[in-house]
């Protein structure tokens, strides 16, 4: 995990530890040499230095090794949003246009309709509709409760967390058996994505 915003030390010109160019995370800056210089040369290949924690290997590993940054708030990865097909819109079974409206803070989305008679989960609301709903909820004579509305990547995260992928996969298989034509093709596409997520065990 990258925990510091530093890149290179201006005096030593070496990458800062735990920074954006960290050798412990991404690999050595020089071939077959650890950060502190205890191990140099090919004969120490594969050794992890006990002082600095850097693996003695080729510097080219830095081109493909990846670290991660813990963000203060959720963000939507553009590959899963804009890629073809858009995995987020397929998983949520929502049109890509609607998903983009939520991500770019143009529309609110209903996360939980509570006991509201007209709201549905995943229904989009404009800012005016959202404010109107807020007024209804906080009115003195209101009986509305349990209603949740969100916007941005945080709302998408919540919708994705609420998915029951195994149950969805079973339901999709049943629907595919009776569906035909374009609808069947769409269901198969969604089932493929759901099955892939279930197979990774990351749900």
Swiss-Prot record:
<dbReference type="GO" id="GO:0000428">
    <property type="term" value="C:DNA-directed RNA polymerase complex"/>
</dbReference>
<feature type="binding site">
    <location>
        <position position="36"/>
    </location>
    <ligand>
        <name>Zn(2+)</name>
    </ligand>
</feature>
<dbReference type="GO" id="GO:0006351">
    <property type="term" value="P:DNA-templated transcription"/>
</dbReference>
<dbReference type="GO" id="GO:0046872">
    <property type="term" value="F:metal ion binding"/>
</dbReference>
<dbReference type="Pfam" id="PF04997">
    <property type="entry name" value="RNA_pol_Rpb1_1"/>
</dbReference>
<dbReference type="InterPro" id="IPR044893">
    <property type="entry name" value="RNA_pol_Rpb1_clamp_domain"/>
</dbReference>
<feature type="binding site">
    <location>
        <position position="52"/>
    </location>
    <ligand>
        <name>Zn(2+)</name>
    </ligand>
</feature>
<keyword id="KW-0804">Transcription</keyword>
<comment type="function">
    <text>DNA-dependent RNA polymerase catalyzes the transcription of DNA into RNA using the four ribonucleoside triphosphates as substrates.</text>
</comment>
<keyword id="KW-0862">Zinc</keyword>
<comment type="similarity">
    <text>Belongs to the RNA polymerase beta' chain family. RpoC1 subfamily.</text>
</comment>
<comment type="subunit">
    <text>In cyanobacteria the RNAP catalytic core is composed of 2 alpha, 1 beta, 1 beta', 1 gamma and 1 omega subunit. When a sigma factor is associated with the core the holoenzyme is formed, which can initiate transcription.</text>
</comment>
<dbReference type="GO" id="GO:0003677">
    <property type="term" value="F:DNA binding"/>
</dbReference>
<dbReference type="InterPro" id="IPR045867">
    <property type="entry name" value="DNA-dir_RpoC_beta_prime"/>
</dbReference>
<keyword id="KW-0240">DNA-directed RNA polymerase</keyword>
<keyword id="KW-0479">Metal-binding</keyword>
<keyword id="KW-0808">Transferase</keyword>
<feature type="binding site">
    <location>
        <position position="34"/>
    </location>
    <ligand>
        <name>Zn(2+)</name>
    </ligand>
</feature>
<keyword id="KW-0548">Nucleotidyltransferase</keyword>
<feature type="binding site">
    <location>
        <position position="49"/>
    </location>
    <ligand>
        <name>Zn(2+)</name>
    </ligand>
</feature>
<dbReference type="GO" id="GO:0003899">
    <property type="term" value="F:DNA-directed RNA polymerase activity"/>
</dbReference>
<protein>
    <recommendedName>
        <fullName>DNA-directed RNA polymerase subunit gamma</fullName>
        <ecNumber>2.7.7.6</ecNumber>
    </recommendedName>
</protein>
<dbReference type="InterPro" id="IPR007080">
    <property type="entry name" value="RNA_pol_Rpb1_1"/>
</dbReference>
């Amino acid at each position: 995990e990258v925990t510091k915003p530093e890149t290179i030390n201006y005096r030593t010109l070496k990458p800062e530890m735990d920074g954006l160019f960290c050798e412990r995370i991404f690999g050595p800056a020089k071939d077959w040499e650890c950060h502190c210089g205890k191990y140099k040369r090919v004969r120490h290949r594969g050794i992890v230095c006990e002082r600095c924690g850097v693996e003695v290997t080729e510097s080219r590993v830095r081109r493909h090794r990846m670290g991660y940054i813990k963000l203060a708030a959720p963000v939507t990865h553009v590959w899963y949003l804009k890629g073809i097909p858009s995995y987020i819109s397929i998983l949520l079974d929502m049109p890509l246009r609607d998903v983009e409206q939520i991500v770019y803070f143009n529309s609110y989305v209903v996360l939980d309709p509570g006991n509201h008679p007209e709201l549905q989960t995943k229904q989009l609301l404009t800012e005016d509709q959202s404010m109107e709903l807020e007024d209804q909820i906080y009115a003195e004579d209101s009986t509305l409760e349990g209603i949740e509305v969100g916007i941005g990547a945080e709302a998408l995260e919540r919708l994705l967390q609420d998915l029951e992928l195994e149950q969805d996969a079973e339901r999709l298989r049943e629907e595919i058996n009776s569906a035909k034509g374009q609808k069947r093709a769409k269901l198969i596409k969604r089932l493929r994505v759901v099955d892939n997520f279930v197979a990774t065990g990351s749900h």
